[in-house]
UniProtKB/Swiss-Prot annotation:
Keywords: Chloroplast, Cytochrome c-type biogenesis, Membrane, Plastid, Thylakoid, Transmembrane, Transmembrane helix. This is Cytochrome c biogenesis protein CcsA. The lineage of its organism: Eukaryota, Viridiplantae, Streptophyta, Embryophyta, Tracheophyta. InterPro entries: Cyt_c_assembly, Cyt_c_biogenesis_CcsA, Cyt_c_biogenesis_CcsA/CcmC. Required during biogenesis of c-type cytochromes (cytochrome c6 and cytochrome f) at the step of heme attachment.
Length: 322
């Protein structure tokens, strides 16, 4: 009873704090000079991380096994992973481009985990025989950590694409307006006035364009490094899973739906890392591959569980309303 109460307290405290953190981050987006609210939000994420850690430890003691046996527990661990990725760079770089991504991801995953849709699987249960192994911690934790890192890196790539294509669109729109005035000959004086107005506008926006260029460069930088970290975790997770599968089922690989999509995920991000080594494909080109990887991860992690088939069917679930 006491462990259930502690779990309930940790869940609500962490969710409340991360909700406040999101609001603070939205406020700080209005200006880079607002430092105090930003520092408060970072301290809030540290408290959230500690609460999620307490939640996992409490559930571990309460259930008698490491909390990675079902979707609810994996979502809590995923939230913990997002908060970990959030606070680790904070001690080295006070402000980076991961903060908004990780904070939003934390509240999204934890909000879904604690919603009424997963009420049936929220109560701890006895592990099925296939999960009663020391490999559970190694394999599943590496896979969830890889999902967290790859999702963060992919979202940074999505942000890079949005900024890049908006920049191209506005540049194309401005150039077409100049050509339209010139071709229809509204008069030399009127044309020159319109042209000068646009040039002045572009001049005043040059600083903004420079900032966008720097932002795109930083997004590409962080995306590459976070995805590289996630790829390492994914590789370790797949290899440890293969060893565990051989011990449990007598085969390293059986092309189970979960295994197949994990392999597809690995291939997609291997392609990303490969083309990223070519300077001509850095930026938007490699970001397109990472964006595709974002969709693949959700299919691998969440979509396959909806099927409820294969050797990983113990992780399946049904959505219910409270």
């Amino acid at each position: 009873m006491i462990f259930s109460t502690l779990e309930h307290i940790f869940t609500h405290i962490s969710f409340s704090i991360v909700s406040i953190v999101i609001i603070i981050h939205l406020i700080t987006l209005l200006g880079n000079e607002i430092i105090k609210p930003y520092d408060s939000s970072e301290k809030g994420m540290i408290v959230t991380f500690l609460c999620l850690t307490g939640l996992l430890i409490t559930r571990w003691i309460y259930s008698g096994h490491f909390p990675l046996s079902d979707l609810y527990e994996s979502l809590i661990f995923l939230s913990w992973s997002f908060s970990l990725i959030h606070i680790v760079p904070y001690f080295k770089i006070r402000k980076n481009y991961l903060t908004e991504i990780t904070a939003s991801s934390t509240i999204f995953t934890q909000g879904f985990a604690t919603s009424g849709l997963l009420t049936e699987i929220r109560k701890p249960t006895i592990l099925v025989p296939a999960l009663q192994s020391e490999w559970l911690i190694m394999h599943v934790s590496m896979m969830i950590l890889s999902y967290a890192a790859l999702l963060c890196g992919s979202l940074l790539s999505v942000a890079l694409l949005v900024i890049t294509f908006r920049k191209i669109f506005y540049s194309y729109k401005s150039n077409n307006f100049l050509k339209l005035n010139e071709s229809f000959s509204f008069g030399e004086i009127q044309y020159k006035n319109e042209r000068n107005n646009i040039l002045k506008k572009n001049y005043f926006l040059s600083a903004k364009n420079y900032y966008k260029a720097q932002l795109i460069q930083q997004l590409d930088y962080w995306s590459y490094r976070v995805i590289s970290l996630g790829f390492i975790f994914l590789t370790i997770g797949i290899l440890s899973g293969a060893v565990w599968a051989n011990e449990a089922w007598g085969s390293y690989w059986s092309w189970d739906p979960k295994e197949t999509w994990a392999f597809i995920t690995w291939i997609v991000f291997a392609i990303y890392l490969h083309i990223r080594t070519n300077k001509n494909f850095q930026g938007a080109n490699s970001a397109i591959v990472a964006t595709l990887g974002f969709l693949i991860i959700w299919i691998c992690y969440f979509g396959v569980n909806l099927l409820g088939i294969g050797l990983h069917s113990y992780g399946s679930f049904t959505l219910t309303s409270s």
